[in-house]
UniProtKB/Swiss-Prot annotation:
InterPro entries: DUF986. Its main location: membrane. It is found in: Cell inner membrane. The lineage of its organism: Bacteria, Pseudomonadati, Pseudomonadota, Gammaproteobacteria, Enterobacterales. It comes from Enterobacter sp. (strain 638). Belongs to the UPF0266 family. HAMAP family: UPF0266. One of its GO terms (cellular component) is plasma membrane. This is UPF0266 membrane protein Ent638_2389. Pfam families: DUF986 (PF06173).
Length: 152
């Protein structure tokens, strides 16, 4: 097993751990889930660039008759990228004392101000940071509003 294979295995394990945490552990942390709202995906161009680079690496490895293990590891990495970029949907998860946004726990008492932009983006102002929540379905903004009013 070469250094390249070890690095690929480490990346695959890290992506698997992230996917497992995002799908199974995070919804169970910090109490019962009151609402989970799917968000719009960001970074489509980044996903295509990453997939293209992986395709180039797989092609080069096959054409130069590289190690079969490396080819398989690159294919597994491509499958993980496909899951993370195209199948998994980002979401905001509301709990009784706070919410998860981009896998970060934010308590409700940290919210200083909330606004809704004209294009349907919920802007949540924290102490030193602004969160831009772009929901997939515009009707979910009303559900978010009801949860915020109920829990505050």
């Amino acid at each position: 097993m070469t250094v390249t294979d070890i690095v690929l295995v480490l990346f695959i394990v890290a992506l698997l751990a992230y996917a497992f945490y995002d799908e199974f552990i995070m919804p169970r942390r910090n109490g019962e889930t009151l609402l989970a709202v799917p968000l719009l995906r960001r970074g489509r161009v980044d996903a295509f660039i990453f997939a293209g680079l992986l395709a180039i690496l797989i092609y080069n490895n096959v054409m130069s008759q590289g190690a079969l293990l490396t080819t398989w590891l690159l294919c597994v990495l491509a499958l993980m990228a496909f899951y993370l970029f195209w199948i998994r949907a980002p979401k905001i998860i509301f709990k009784s004392h706070g919410f998860f946004f981009a896998n970060i726990w934010i308590e409700y008492n940290r919210i200083k101000e909330m606004n809704l932009s004209e294009d349907g983006v919920l802007v949540i102002q924290l102490e030193q940071r602004r969160l831009l929540v772009r929901v997939k379905n515009i009707d979910d903004l009303e559900k978010i509003y009801k949860i915020m009013v109920k829990t505050q």
